[in-house]
């Protein structure tokens, strides 16, 4: 998206009545730069990174970014941190990909000791972790506000809540596609999920969730695609989102996929869900 489309996205999300806007970090905009722009183009919207790569900047810089944005924009920024993927870390950034949990724990310790604002305790910072497996979930509950798992089901949400305990934030991501045409929805899901089915951390988590190897071959089985990308009527989509909430999520991050398979956010489904 260019700057005009990003500003329009923030304005529309806020106008529809949503409380937050989340974005990823890959090879486009740098996380803190984009967060500042989105915050500047909204009034009350909470902006979160989903997620900022810990290999993209050192822990002191992350502490500065988190503390600075929250000071400038009245505590409207959430820093979601993640270890990303081997290919992004080693092939694109040229770093060595470490063991996920130990690397994240070390990063958080450095962030805690950064000394940017001596009056701000680590537990008071708006930091959550991209966590899928139980050990990263445990770290998220122990060191931060909570977790933001990606591409999961309501059953997973219930299990994650059990690991996190009752107090930690649990913000789960859910892809949706507003179409009642099965073939259309499945085509969108295949296009969306194909990129993720080659990354070990997601594959391992989906296997833990009960999917079989056959479900995760190629672009994914119909069973897998329907579980990860919810499609159908507004009522059906809303019901699936509510399943996450009743399973223990505090917040559901909706990724609205366009039914025609084009890139970008599907505003009609966001507007429809906002009215529910």
Model-derived regions: residue spans:
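Active-site-adjacent structural elements that line small-molecule/cofactor binding pockets in enzymes
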Residues: 1-276
């Amino acid at each position: 998206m260019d700057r005009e489309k990003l500003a329009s996205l923030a304005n529309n999300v806020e106008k529809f009545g949503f409380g937050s806007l989340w974005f990823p970090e890959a090879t486009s905009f740098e996380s803190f730069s984009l967060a500042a722009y989105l915050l500047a183009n909204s009034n009350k919207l909470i902006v979160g990174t989903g997620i900022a790569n810990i290999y993209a900047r050192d822990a002191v810089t992350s502490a500065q970014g988190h503390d600075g944005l929250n000071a400038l924009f009245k505590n409207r920024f959430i820093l979601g941190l993640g270890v990303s993927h081997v290919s992004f870390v080693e092939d694109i950034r040229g770093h060595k990909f470490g063991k996920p949990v130990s690397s994240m724990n070390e990063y958080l310790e450095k962030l805690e000791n950064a000394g940017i604002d001596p009056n701000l305790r680590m537990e008071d910072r708006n930091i959550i972790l991209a966590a899928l497996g139980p050990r990263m979930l445990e770290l998220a509950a122990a060191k931060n506000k909570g977790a933001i798992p990606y591409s999961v089901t309501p059953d997973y949400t219930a299990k994650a809540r059990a690991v996190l305990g009752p107090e930690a934030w649990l913000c789960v991501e859910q892809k949706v596609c507003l179409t009642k045409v099965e073939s259309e929805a499945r085509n969108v899901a295949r296009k969306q999920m194909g990129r993720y089915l080659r990354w070990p951390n997601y594959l391992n988590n989906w296997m833990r969730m009960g999917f079989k190897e056959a479900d995760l071959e190629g672009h994914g089985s119909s069973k897998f695609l329907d579980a990860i990308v919810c499609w159908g009527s507004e009522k059906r989509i809303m019901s699936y989102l509510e399943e996450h909430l009743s399973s223990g999520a505090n917040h559901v991050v909706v990724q609205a996929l366009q039914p025609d398979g084009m890139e970008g956010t599907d505003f009609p489904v966001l507007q429809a869900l906002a009215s529910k």
